[in-house]
Curated annotation (Swiss-Prot):
Residues at the catalytic site: 200, 299
Catalysed reactions, semicolon-separated: Hydrolysis of terminal non-reducing beta-D-galactose residues in beta-D-galactosides
GO molecular function: beta-galactosidase activity
Chief location category: secreted
This protein's name: Probable beta-galactosidase A
Family annotation (Gene3D superfamilies): Beta-galactosidase, domain 2, Beta-galactosidase, domain 3, Galactose-binding domain-like, Glycosidases
Subcellular location per the Swiss-Prot or TrEMBL entry: Secreted
InterPro entries tied to this protein: Betagal_dom2, Betagal_dom2_sf, BetaGal_dom3, BetaGal_dom3_sf, BetaGal_jelly_roll_dom, Galactose-bd-like_sf, Gly_Hdrlase_35_cat, Glyco_hydro_35_CS
Keyword annotations of the record: Carbohydrate metabolism, Disulfide bond, Glycoprotein, Glycosidase, Hydrolase, Polysaccharide degradation, Secreted, Signal
Coiled coil feature spans: none
GO cellular component terms attached to this protein's record: extracellular region
């Protein structure tokens, strides 16, 4: 561990005075001041002041996006996501760790294979991305239990408090995960620069009054420090509440941060921006709550979740689109945010039952990078404009935010301007303009009156007016430094600038139909060296050359001394990329002034991942979804050849030194199997309803008391599944009784989370189902029973679809302890105690059998308990029948088939399994989709909305055999079948991505003790 020397440690201990906190670290005792704002640093790499974070002594704007490694279980695809984030101009990624996946059994921590975090850390380092680690223990994250393993339902104590045994239950996980993270800190050459203890520790209810509990937070922080965490602690208050900010005493973090989801989650109305939802007081609150730390928004809305029965993530992407980014993100910039993390930048998939019941399999989130990892959403391109601007604008980081005004800088109250002023008139200032009614769709003409080093100027100076279109916002700059050239002002926005061997380049852009103006101090003349001069005028005013221009879809370049100004429309700017050009090797390295200065500008299409120089060859690694013209702006003088994705490419060089080339794209031939024509084999996966079924191997539900402290029993023995170690997937119950002839009805209340369902049989007679809805997490059902023979033994079989455990966002509410299973029941003519119950879930419960795919992937269906969802199941005694034929009565059937793929190499080809439904109203049935043993889809036909399930390469074998399996659960008298089920692809992307490695896919083998 590259920590402090023993001498430095001793000196540090001697320096700290007052009430102190002790940590054991590498054999030394460290004592920290209880007040985080007065602590000495434990390392020298990551520091901060009121403006920003410093890394290795260099002040940085941290632009970050949220990625969850557990939602993409293919390690060789991590680099793809990181490179796409790096290409945005970002320099950081935040990630959660899901405790429930790593300690499925109390005391048994395992983080191997797809759950190993080291490949994630390695990919971040390779891409040059810093990391913020957020291991909880509580994470929320729309995962089952908010990241809590199901066995916490049995913990005697209040979750997320010091009450009872909760904190003790976190010890094993907390120490293991913190040690893993500690090894990957920047102090050890790793990418991790910040650590967040707990998550959104921001509110309590239900009689819990000791909030916020500094001792509770301190316990979590101590665990991290004791395990070797030396990077700064940062928080993410759910709102700007000041909880655990520096100076608040025990449990205070080093850097205070908060979240913001101001537009909400109404994806059903994607064009509606409600009045009053734009934050206006973030800076004021920051100055009140944590003025000595950089303003940090640790989660800001990058998309939205969508519930069962929702409208789908396409509409969420529309709600939180490029217009949202322009208005809301620039508004955050107006407050001087310098740690800015977007939740999510890539959402991924809730595979293997890892999601909470409020969401379905997809966790696309409407984010900039889609679930299938494509970057075709306009919001990705818009974000690239802002990310690259932030990267080349060091003056922004130290500018001082002022108060918003509708009169000081413009003459119309329809517009609001918030200034970020430099320390002096020549230090560079930024002015964020938006509609006063932020949701206005009107187009407003305006002029600006701005302070500059040349005095106060009214702009445009050469006539005309500026325009702010509806749902738009701009950042105007004054005294903006471009490698020694002073841009006195620019009304057009800056994308990037660079100083090259042959001069400087500045790229400005504007919206369609806009008029803009910029001025360059000390310049006297300009010339248009590319494109038409129509719509461009210039004039020397005072010591500056003023240039006015009308936005055009055709690029113009103006030369002013050694400065070339590229004038673009916004859509054209989307095609520009600014990859770092490392001075040695291929890896781009982390962001630094040196890395920024050595970058080149590439005009391309779909994606530019990276660039590097090898001898006289300039290499560009890029992806293409169409034939694309390429331009290199600022190629090093030592470069003589252009190599794109390993192929030397013919180039032309124009009079301005711009290299041009072209990459041809042709759609490859892709042959996908017809799933309807596969050789399907099937088996009844509900043998439990047969009179001959023997459930003697099942768990007896005979505990007279529940260990769940949040819910009282309403049954003679507990039927809460987690009391018996079953926390995931389908649950089955069998209740045995002797009939007395009075059994006219059966009442049952079950609980399984949103969109869950249940079905009930008495012996082999189907009596009914709750088909599910997006709004019910439990249901009371009363069923009429057939006449039963007095004195005969009967079994009631209840199948319950567990949709995941609830999150525990509000302390004291104990949402995670909401049980799954049977809550209460009544059989007419019998006392409740007359029924003796057995239950099962996944085979082994917490002693789960498939340690490769983890503790949540399997549920309790017979086929799952046997392992038939894995590749090459034993189908000797199965039937030859297809899910397209399905069932003719209520029940559950399991289907398995295989197919081969041999897809073209060199392409990233997104594949989807699509379910179709042509009936109205929709038939009531449920399907689980397993791909090579991984549950990669949970489809509820009558609830929705998800019908298309992307499965990444690595789970699917693109060059080999694949096994798919389906469980088809019919919840209606007529049975169910699949009307349509297809494997489809979207546009193949010609890619420079390295070959994707398939994850471990253990094949079926007979399971000892399976029943």
């Amino acid at each position: 561990m590259k920590l402090l020397s023993s001498l430095a440690l001793a000196a540090l201990a001697a320096q700290v005075s007052g009430a102190a906190i002790s940590h054991k670290l590498d054999g030394f005792t460290l004592r920290e001041h209880a007040d985080a704002s007065k602590r000495e640093l434990l390392q020298k790499y990551v520091t901060w002041d009121k403006h920003s974070i410093f890394i290795n002594g260099e002040r940085l704007m941290m632009f970050s996006g949220e990625v969850h490694p557990y939602r993409l279980p293919v390690a060789s695809l991590y680099i793809d996501v990181f490179e796409k984030i790096k290409a945005l101009g970002f320099n950081c990624v935040s990630f959660y760790v899901d405790w429930a996946l790593l300690e499925g059994k109390p005391g048994h921590y395992t983080a191997e294979g797809i759950f190993d975090l080291q490949p994630f850390f390695d990919a971040a380092k390779e891409a040059g991305i810093y990391l913020l680690a957020r291991p909880g223990p509580y994470i929320n994250a729309e995962v089952s239990g908010g990241g809590f393993p199901g066995w916490l339902q049995r913990v005697n104590g209040t979750l997320r408090t010091s009450i009872g045994d909760y904190l003790k239950s976190t010890d094993n996980y907390a120490s293991h995960i913190a040690k893993t993270i500690a090894k990957a800190q920047i102090t050890n050459g790793g990418p991790i620069i910040l650590y967040q203890p707990e998550n959104e520790y921001s509110g309590a209810c239900c009689g819990y009054e000791d909030f916020p509990d500094g001792s509770y937070m301190q316990y979590i922080e101590d665990h991290a420090r004791d395990a070797g965490i030396v990077v700064p602690f940062i928080s993410n208050d759910a709102y700007a509440g000041g909880h655990n900010a520096p100076g608040t005493g025990k449990g205070a973090v080093d850097i205070y941060g908060h979240d913001g989801y101001p537009l909400g989650f109404d994806c059903a109305n994607p064009s509606v921006w409600p009045d009053g939802n734009l934050p206006t007081n973030y800076h004021t609150l920051h100055e009140e709550q944590s003025p000595t730390t950089p303003f940090s928004v640790v989660e800001f809305q990058g998309g939205a979740f969508d519930p069962w029965g929702g409208v789908g993530f396409a509409k969420c992407a529309h709600l939180l689109n490029h217009e949202f980014e322009r208005v809301f993100y620039k508004n955050d910039f107006s407050f001087g945010v310098t740690f800015f993390n977007l939740y999510m930048i890539f959402g991924g998939t809730n595979w293997g039952n890892l999601g909470h019941p409020g969401g379905y399999t997809s966790y696309d989130y409407g984010s900039a990078i889609s679930e299938s990892r494509n970057v075709t959403r306009e919001k990705y391109s818009e974000l690239k404009l802002l990310g690259n601007f932030a990267k080349v604008s060091p003056g922004y980081v130290v500018a001082n935010p002022g108060n918003l005004t509708t009169s000081k800088y413009t003459k119309t109250a329809d517009l609001t301007v918030t200034p970020l002023l430099g320390e002096s008139s020549s230090a560079g200032s930024f002015f964020v303009i938006r509609h006063s009614n932020y949701n206005s769709q009107a187009s407003v003409k305006y002029q600006l009156t701005l302070p500059t080093s040349a005095g106060e100027l009214t702009i445009p100076q050469l006539g005309g007016e500026l325009t702010l279109s509806g749902r738009d916002s701009k950042i105007h700059v004054t005294d903006y430094d471009v490698a020694g050239s002073n841009i006195l002002y620019s009304t057009a926005e800056v994308f990037t600038w660079k100083k090259f061997d042959n001069g400087k380049v500045l790229i400005l852009y504007g919206g369609p139909g806009e008029h803009h103006e910029f001025a360059v101090t000390g310049a006297s003349a300009s010339s248009v060296i590319e494109g038409s001069s129509s719509g461009i005028t210039s004039k020397k005013i005072g010591d500056a050359l003023v240039v006015a221009w009308d936005v055009s879809s055709k690029r113009r370049i103006i030369k002013i001394g050694d400065l070339k100004v590229f004038l673009l429309d916004r859509n054209s700017a989307y095609n520009y990329w600014v990859p770092h050009l490392p001075t040695k090797g291929k890896a781009p390295g982390y962001v630094s002034k040196k890395a920024i200065d050595s970058s080149i500008i590439v005009k391309a299409g779909y994606l530019v991942r990276s660039a590097f120089l090898s001898g006289k060859d300039l290499h560009i690694q890029a992806d293409f979804n169409a034939t694309t013209p390429i331009e290199i702006i600022g190629a090093p003088s030592s470069a003589k050849n252009l190599v794109i994705n390993g192929k030397k490419t013919k180039t032309n060089v124009d009079d301005n030194g711009i290299w041009s080339a072209s990459v041809s794209y042709s759609t490859p031939e892709i042959h996908l199997p017809s799933l309807k024509d596969l050789k399907w084999q099937s088996i009844d996966t509900l043998p439990e309803v047969k009179n001959s079924y023997d459930d003697s191997a099942w768990t007896s539900a005979d505990q007279p008391h529940t260990l769940n402290t949040a819910h009282e029993l309403q049954t003679p023995t507990t039927l809460f599944s987690s009391d018996y170690g079953y926390h995931t997937g389908t649950l089955l119950y069998r209740g045995h009784f002797v009939a007395n002839g009075k059994e006219s009805i059966f009442f049952i209340q079950t609980q399984g989370g949103s969109a869950y369902g249940h079905s009930v049989w008495v012996n082999e007679t189907y009596v009914g189902s709750w088909e599910g809805s997006g709004s019910n997490d439990n249901y009371n059902a009363t069923y009429t029973l057939p006449s039963l023979a007095t004195g005969k033994k009967y079994a009631i079989t209840v199948v319950i679809d567990n949709m995941g455990l609830d999150v525990n966002w509000v302390i004291g509410q104990e949402g995670m302890k909401n049980p799954r299973g049977i809550i209460r029941y009544n059989l007419a003519g019998h006392d409740a105690s007359a029924i003796s119950w057995k239950l099962t879930g996944n085979l082994g419960g917490e002693d789960y059998r498939d340690t490769v795919r983890g503790p949540l992937n399997e549920g309790g269906l017979y086929a799952e308990r046997q392992g038939f969802h894995q590749p090459k199941p034993s189908t000797k005694n199965w039937d030859s029948s297809s899910p397209f034929t399905g069932l003719t009565k209520p029940g559950i059937r399991f289907y398995s088939a295989s197919f081969d793929l041999d897809l073209p190499s060199g392409y990233d080809i997104p594949l989807y399994f699509n379910f179709g439904n042509s009936t109205a109203p929709p038939d009531a049935y449920r399907v689980q989709l397993f791909v090579n043993g991984y549950q990669y889809g949970k489809y509820v036909n009558n609830v929705g909305p998800q019908t298309s399930f992307p499965v990444p390469e690595g789970i699917l074998n693109y060059h080999g055999t694949n096994w798919i399996a389906l469980s088809l659960w019919a919840q209606q008298e007529s049975g169910a079948k699949l009307n349509s089920f297809e494997l489809i692809n979207t546009t193949p992307v010609l890619t420079s991505l390295d070959k994707v490695k398939s994850v471990d896919q253990p094949k079926y083998k007979s399971r000892k003790g399976a029943y």
